[in-house]
Design a protein with these regions (language model features):
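Extended active-site and interfacial segments that coordinate phosphate-rich ligands
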Residues: 21, 86-117, 140-197, 232-286, ...
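Conserved phosphate/anionic-ligand binding catalytic regions in large, soluble enzymes, centered on
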Residues: 15-41, 70-99, 138-180, 218-241, ...
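Contiguous hydrophobic, helix-prone segments at protein termini
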Residues: 212-215, 226-227, 242, 269-697
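Structural motif
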Residues: 33, 38, 66-68, 88, ...
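Phosphate-interacting basic helix/loop segments used at nucleotide- and nucleic-acid interfaces
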Residues: 49-66, 132, 199-220, 224
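N-terminal beta-alpha lobe that positions the nucleotide/phosphoryl donor
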Residues: 1-134, 143, 384-400, 406, ...
C-alpha cells in the first residue's frame, strides 16, 4: 500500500506511515480539525520509487492547489525523541512535478548529516528507520505558532505555553522571528500581542483535551485561518519533560523529594531494584516514626514529604535534614516552599510518634555509649566481617529461592553494633558548626573532617592502590588492553595474580549505583576496577599516591583541630574542653558513616545472587532471553511468572527500552510538585559573569587543572592532576578520585560519599554546580575553590601552563589555606 488518505490511517500504523502521519491520524480520531491530506507510505520508500499515478490522483482530490510536503519517518515524533527539524519540510508546493520532487527530497533528508547525527545520539539504528511523506492542503494563516500542553521550562502540567506570530508558524518553529509568548494557567489571559484572549482560551482547552486523551503532554503546531478557524498541523509528545508523579487521591499539591541524591545516584533504578528499595526505605523511615509514601517517578525514588512540610513542628527541622543529608539543592527547595501558602502549616494533624518513642531509649544508650567508648568501633568492623563471611545455602529451584528474595531482611542481632556508632558520628559532625560558631568557618570544620580514619570506602580505595603497586610489573598489559577485555580475561582466570581476587573477595559486592539489586557487582563485572587500576598506574610521582595524600590530609586535620581547641579555650576553658571532646569524637566516629551501608550491601549481594539463579531457570524454560533480564521485573511480577508461568518477555523488552532511555537522561529534578513542576525552576536564577560557576564548597583547598568530564565511571580515566567533573558521585566513583586534582559535581551533599572521600584525600570539591557537565569541556583549564564554592573557567585563549595543574599544587594550596586559618 503506497498512498493512504490521512482519514483512513490507524494511529497504530507507525511502521507504515511514520510518526507524523500517525500523530495526525490520532488528532483526526479525536475530532479536531486537521487539514486534508494523504501519506506516501514507507512501502514506497523501501522500493525507492515514488508512486507517481497514486500521488497525482490523491493530489487532484485535494484540489491541486498549494500543499505542505512533510517528512514522516518511523523514528519521528517518538515518546523519547521528537526529531524536530531533523528531516525536511516544504511549504506552499504547487504543481504535480514539484510535489513529486518534494517527496523525493523528503526521502533524501532521511540520510542528511543532521538526521544521522540525531539518530546516533538517540541510540536509534540507521538501518531500522524508514521514511513516509505527508502531503496536506496548505492553510493560509492569520496567526500561527506552537502550543505546549505543559510548561517545557518548569514541567508544570497545570500550565500551557503558547508562542504565536502573525502569518506562517515556521518563523516561530524555527526561531527565526520574535514571537508573542503566553503562559496559560487557567486565569483570564491578557489582551496583548497577536493572540486574542478568546483564542488563548480555545488553545488551552484544546491542549488540555489532547494531553488527557493522548496520554502525555504534547507539542502542537497550530494555525488560525483568515476565517478564524483553528487548525492543528501536528502533535507530538514533548520528549524533554521529566515524568510527572503518579496521580494521588490525597489533597494537593504534593511535594516529592528525590532520594537518589543522598546516595549520589542519578541513574534509573531497575524494576527489581525498585521493589527492594521502596520496601527498605519505607521500613527505615518507619523506624524513626516517619510515614512517607515512596513512589517511582522516571525510575527514580521520590518520597512524598508534604505532610512534614505542613506540620507546624517538623517543617523547620526538615530544612536542617535537607542540609545534612540531601544537600544544598534540596535545602533551597524546602526553604523556598516554606513561604508558599499551598504548604502553610496545618494545625491538629500531628500524629503521636510512637515508633520514635520506642526507639528513643535505645538511641540514647547507643549514642552515649559510642561517645563514651569510641574504641567500640572495633565491634563495627567485627560485625561487618561476620556478615560478609557468614555461610549462605541457596535452595535449588526458583520456587524455593523466591521466598528468600521476597522476605524483608530481619535485622541481624549485631547490627546495633554498627548503627549507633554510625549515627553518633553523623550527629557529632552535624553539631560542629553550632558548637564552633564564631570560632571556626565551614572550610575549617571541613578540614578537621579530612583524612578521617575508619572509612570503609577510603580503605577500599587504598586497598586498590596497593593492588596497583603490586601490578606494576604488568603495567604494559593493564594499560594496553581495554577494561572490558581485562575483565573477561580475569573472569576466565587468564591474568597474572596481582591480588585482585583478594580485593574482590572483600569489596566485590560494591559497584556504582550499588543500592540497586539489578546492577552487576564488581565481582561479576570488574571492568570499572580495571579502569581504576589503569588510572593508578599512570601516577608516577610517589608523593601523589593516595596513601601520601591521605596522610597529608590527616596531618592538616589534626593541626586544625588543635588550633580550634586553642581558640575555644581562649574564649572559655569549658568551651575549649567541649570543643576538643566533640572534634575528637567527630574524627574518631564520622568516618564510620559508610559502614552501615557497606554491611547492608552483603544482604543485597545475596538477594542479587538468588535473583540470577531464578533468572537462569527462567531462561532455561524460555521465559527470559538472559538470566540478568530478571532485573526488569518487579517482585510481584516475578511471583506471577514463577507460580503461573506468565510469559514476561514483552514486558521485559518494553522495560529495557524505557531503562535505556532513562539512562540517557542528563538531569533529574531534586524535587517535584504533583503537577510535574521542577521546584528548582521556581527559585531565583543565580547570577554569573559567564566564567564563574557557583555551587557549594564541600572540601577545602584550591586547584587549577584541565577538566575531565565523566558521565559514567565504568571505563573512565582521569590523568593525574585533572579536575574530575561529574553529574554525581557514589562510592563506585571514588576510585577516580585517587588521581584527580579536584572534584566538581552537579548534585550531592557536603556529608555525602563523594565530598567525604575528597576531604580524605585533601582535594578541593565543589558540589551542586548546575549544568557543570554541559558548561565545562574536557581539557578546559578550570580553577576549583572549595572554600568559596566556585569553579572558574579560563578564558578560551588562556595558556594551559599558566598555573598549578597537578595534585601537588592542589595539596599545597590546601595546606596554605589551612595554615593561614589556623593562625587567625
Amino acid at each position: 500500500m503506497d498512498v493512504l488518505e490521512l482519514s483512513a490511517i490507524d494511529p497504530e500504523q507507525r511502521e507504515l506511515v511514520g510518526g507524523k502521519a500517525a500523530g495526525l491520524a490520532a488528532l483526526i480520531r479525536l475530532g479536531v480539525r486537521v487539514p486534508d491530506g494523504f501519506c506516501v507510505t514507507t512501502d514506497a520508500h523501501s522500493r525507492g520509487e515514488v508512486p507517481r499515478t497514486e500521488v497525482l490522483a490523491a493530489y487532484e482530490r485535494l484540489g491541486a492547489g498549494p500543499v505542505a510536503v512533510r517528512s514522516s519517518a518511523t523514528a519521528e515524533d517518538l515518546p523519547d525523541a521528537s526529531f524536530a527539524g531533523q528531516q525536511d519540510t516544504f511549504l506552499a508546493v504547487e504543481g504535480a512535478e514539484d510535489v513529486l520532487a518534494a517527496i523525493r527530497a523528503c526521502w533524501d533528508s532521511l540520510h542528511s548529516e543532521r538526521a544521522t547525527a540525531y539518530r546516533k545520539a538517540a541510540g536509534i539504528g540507521h538501518d531500522a528507520v524508514r521514511m513516509a511523506v505527508v502531503v496536506q492542503r496548505m492553510v493560509d494563516p492569520e496567526v500561527a505558532g506552537v502550543l505546549f500542553t505543559a510548561n517545557p521550562l518548569t514541567g508544570s502540567r497545570s500550565e500551557c505555553v503558547v508562542d504565536a506570530a502573525p502569518g506562517l508558524g515556521t518563523a516561530v518553529v524555527d526561531g527565526a522571528a520574535p514571537a508573542d509568548h503566553y503562559v496559560l494557567d487557567g486565569t483570564a489571559p491578557e489582551e496583548r500581542g497577536c493572540l486574542a484572549p478568546a483564542r488563548s482560551n480555545e488553545l488551552r482547552e484544546v491542549g488540555e483535551r489532547l494531553r488527557s486523551r493522548l496520554g502525555a503532554p504534547q507539542d502542537v503546531e497550530w494555525a488560525y485561518d483568515k476565517d478564524g478557524t483553528l487548525w492543528l498541523l501536528q502533535s507530538r509528545p514533548i520528549t524533554t519533560l521529566f515524568p510527572a508523579p503518579p496521580a494521588s487521591d490525597r489533597p494537593g499539591p504534593r511535594l516529592y523529594v528525590e532520594f537518589g541524591h543522598v546516595q549520589g545516584m542519578l541513574q534509573p533504578v531497575t524494576p527489581v531494584g525498585m521493589s527492594t528499595l521502596k520496601e527498605m526505605l519505607a521500613g527505615m523511615l518507619a523506624s524513626f516514626g516517619m510515614t512517607v509514601e515512596i513512589v517511582d517517578i522516571g525510575g527514580r525514588l521520590y518520597g512524598d514529604l508534604t505532610d512534614a512540610m505542613r506540620d507546624p513542628v517538623t517543617r523547620r527541622r526538615l530544612v536542617k535534614l535537607m542540609a545534612v543529608d540531601f544537600g544544598p539543592r534540596a535545602q533551597a527547595v524546602v526553604e523556598h516552599l516554606l513561604d508558599d501558602p499551598r504548604f502553610a502549616p496545618v494545625r491538629g494533624t500531628r500524629r503521636r510518634n510512637t515508633a520514635a518513642l520506642g526507639t528513643a531509649p535505645k538511641a540514647v544508650v547507643g549514642i552515649l555509649g559510642a561517645l563514651a567508648r569510641p574504641a567500640a568501633r572495633a565491634r563495627v568492623f567485627g560485625t561487618i566481617e561476620r556478615l560478609g563471611r557468614q555461610p549462605v545455602v541457596d535452595p535449588p529451584t526458583a520456587a524455593e529461592l523466591l521466598p528468600l528474595v521476597e522476605e524483608t531482611e530481619r535485622p541481624d542481632a549485631g547490627v546495633e553494633a554498627i548503627t549507633w556508632p554510625v549515627v553518633t558520628g553523623i550527629l557529632v559532625a552535624a553539631v560542629l558548626p553550632a558548637l564552633l560558631k564564631d570560632i571556626a568557618g565551614d572550610d575549617e570544620i571541613r578540614t578537621v573532617l579530612g583524612g578521617m580514619p575508619h572509612n570503609v570506602t577510603i580503605e577500599m580505595d587504598l586497598a586498590l592502590w596497593q593492588v596497583a603497586r603490586r601490578a606494576a610489573p604488568c603495567r604494559e598489559l593493564l594499560l594496553g588492553r581495554s577494561p572490558d577485555e581485562l575483565a573477561a580475561a580475569h573472569l576466565a582466570g587468564e591474568l597474572p595474580d596481582i591480588g585482585l581476587t583478594t580485593f574482590l573477595d572483600t569489596y566485590g559486592h560494591r559497584c556504582a549505583a550499588e543500592v540497586d539489586a539489578g546492577v552487576p557487582r564488581w565481582s561479576e563485572a570488574p571492568a570499572p576496577v580495571f579502569a581504576a587500576l589503569a588510572n593508578y598506574l599512570r601516577v608516577t610521582d610517589p608523593d601523589q599516591g593516595p596513601d601520601r595524600r591521605f596522610e597529608r590530609a590527616a596531618v592538616r586535620a589534626e593541626l586544625m583541630l588543635a588550633e580550634l581547641v586553642r581558640r575555644a579555650r581562649r574564649e572559655r576553658p569549658l568551651r575549649g574542653r567541649l570543643a576538643g571532646f566533640f572534634l575528637r569524637r567527630a574524627r574518631e566516629l564520622a568516618g564510620l558513616r559508610e559502614a552501615g551501608k557497606f554491611a547492608g550491601l552483603y544482604a543485597l549481594r545475596d538477594r542479587r545472587r538468588r535473583l540470577l539463579l531464578i533468572g537462569a531457570e527462567l531462561r532455561e524454560k524460555g521465559l527470559l532471553e538472559r538470566a540478568d533480564d530478571i532485573r526488569f521485573l518487579t517482585l510481584p511480577e516475578l511471583r506471577s511468572v514463577v507460580d503461573g508461568g506468565d510469559d514476561p518477555r514483552r514486558t521485559v523488552a518494553e522495560r529495557k527500552s524505557h531503562y535505556a532511555r532513562e539512562l540517557r537522561r542528563r538531569t533529574v529534578p531534586v524535587a517535584l510538585l504533583s503537577d510535574g513542576t521542577d521546584v528548582e525552576t521556581l527559585l531565583p536564577a543565580r547570577t554569573s559573569d559567564g566564567r564563574t560557576l557557583t555551587g557549594t564548597g564541600a572540601a577545602t583547598g584550591r586547584a587549577r587543572g584541565p577538566a575531565r568530564v565523566v558521565r559514567d565511571p565504568a571505563d573512565a580515566y582521569v590523568e593525574p592532576g585533572e579536575i574530575l567533573v561529574a553529574p554525581t558521585s557514589d562510592p563506585g566513583w571514588t576510585p577516580l578520585f585517587l588521581t584527580a586534582g579536584g572534584l566538581v559535581t552537579e548534585t550531592g551533599a557536603v556529608m555525602a560519599h563523594g565530598p567525604t572521600v575528597a576531604r580524605e584525600y585533601g582535594i578541593p570539591a565543589v558540589i551542586c554546580v548546575p549544568g557543570a557537565t554541559d558548561r565545562i569541556r574536557t581539557g578546559q583549564m578550570i580553577t576549583v575553590d572549595g572554600a568559596a564554592g566556585t569553579v572558574t573557567l579560563d578564558a578560551p585563549d588562556a595558556e594551559p601552563g599558566g598555573g598549578p595543574r597537578v595534585g601537588v599544587a592542589a595539596d599545597a594550596d590546601a595546606v596554605s589555606a589551612s595554615s593561614g586559618s589556623a593562625g587567625g
